[in-house]
Amino acid sequence: VPLAYLFAYALHRTLIPFKSLWRGISLLPLLAPSMLPGIALVYLFGNQGLLRSLLTESIYGYWGLVLGEVIYTFPHALMILLSALSMSDARLFDAASSLGASSWRTFRSVTWSSSRHGIFAALCLVFTLTITDFGIPVVVGGDYQVLALEAYKAVLGQQQFGRGALIGMLLLLPALLTFGVDVWLRKRQRDAMSSRAQFYLPKANFQRDTLYLIFVMLICALFLLVFGTAVYSSFIQFWPYNLSFSLRHYNFEGLPGGWLAYTNSIILAFYTATIGCFLIFMGAYLIEKTASHSWLNNLLRMLSFVPMAVPGLVLGLGYVFFFNLPNNPLNFLYGSMVLLVLCSIAHFFTTAYMTASTALRQLDKEFEAASLSLKAPLYRHFWRITIPLCLPALLDIYRYLFVSAMTTVSAAIFLYSPDTILAAVAVLNMDDAGNIGGAAAMSTLILTTSAGVSILLSIASQGVLRRTQAWHQREAKQ
């Protein structure tokens, strides 16, 4: 979290060049399964690693877990901190400067006070992600025992579902505790921006900007080294003895998963993004734009935050106990793609809902008033006004659901069948079988697919934003 805070501060409070480039590189771990940083660390610092001599201890164990989880959780914390540091009132900085406050005093009184709730939210998220992740512990954990890996071994390795459920509850308790504290702090947080606030623009400072640029470049260089090594290793004949170019790791025939797993992941991501985007946006619209039954809206709004507090591993265990019951009429769904889609939508519901809800709240109520005065039916207003204005947010939701479904492993690890195995699960199985080259190749496919879809949707979102916001620009010119 401290590294992510400094990175976010550099992007928002300095004048370093190429901010979009640094931000894009820092978000790379979001596009790959959590096992990929672990695989890259093995190639870099493992027994046959390129940089093995730089470490005095083995990468397999505590320090491997720490380094892998830092890389994996960094972009998650960064996104929260970027949001926390994006809103600042320039009048507060002007007042501090007029009173002769030092840079440190201004930072402590203005910047820190307005962003400390975001820091705690990032701490809660990183804590929850770390204790519930078992992708990195599987790859570089060694003999170091973690709860998530024990739950995985209990259910799949030993068929001890009761023990797995107990460990799942232990994982749920700290996640619920941190989530509850975060909600309580959010209620006490004051608005950082008022209606009269002025947008803050940092002033040029060569020494400060140079130091932060060096820091940002070092972080991005680390990410490029890690992910570049993983991608490079997937095209190597036999690491580290034969470094000639080869595509043999992409020949997944005869291996658990293979191209079927990759195809299944694309199908899962497509249906999760398409169906989830529609259901979540419609649900957010009914909650935010329905005036009647406010108590019901508040209840539904509160329930929409529940998936954020439930780790994916616990959610997957719950689906196993419910859908795997022989007397359950829905038992036929167990192991099917339908159940994987439902679980993925539920798992990633909260973030997508918050995006849709924020977009809908930004729409002026005068739009509805104008439609009512013109006696336009609700569906026409929804299709002609709401959808076009919220289309950039819809594309962001679609991108988030697609990428998350492509990289998910925790919620789906207990729910797949041989016919519905996913690419991220195949990475896990290949690594367990000792085929780390195949695991790197599959991770590379996931990374490139997620990056390609994200770039296409980002371009589409910018184009839609220019068209839908053109009336704002004309109004400003007038």
Regions found by a protein language model. Name each.
Residues 1-86, 114-135, 164-183, 208-238, ...:
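Membrane-water interface segments at the C-terminal ends of transmembrane alpha-helices
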Residues 23-26, 90-98, 109, 153-156, ...:
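Short amphipathic alpha-helical coupling elements at transmembrane boundaries
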Residues 51-57, 140-141, 146-162, 234-236, ...:
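Membrane-interface interhelical loops and short amphipathic "cap" helices
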Residues 99-101, 280, 374-376:
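A short glycine-centered flexible hinge/capping loop motif at secondary-structure junctions
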Residues 102, 190-204, 239-253, 377:
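Juxtamembrane inter-helical linkers in multi-pass membrane proteins
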Residues 134-159, 241-242, 409-436, 470-475:
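Glycine-rich helix-loop "coupling/hinge" segments at transmembrane-helix boundaries
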Residues 182-217, 295-297, 459-478:
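Transmembrane alpha-helical segments of polytopic membrane transport and secretion proteins
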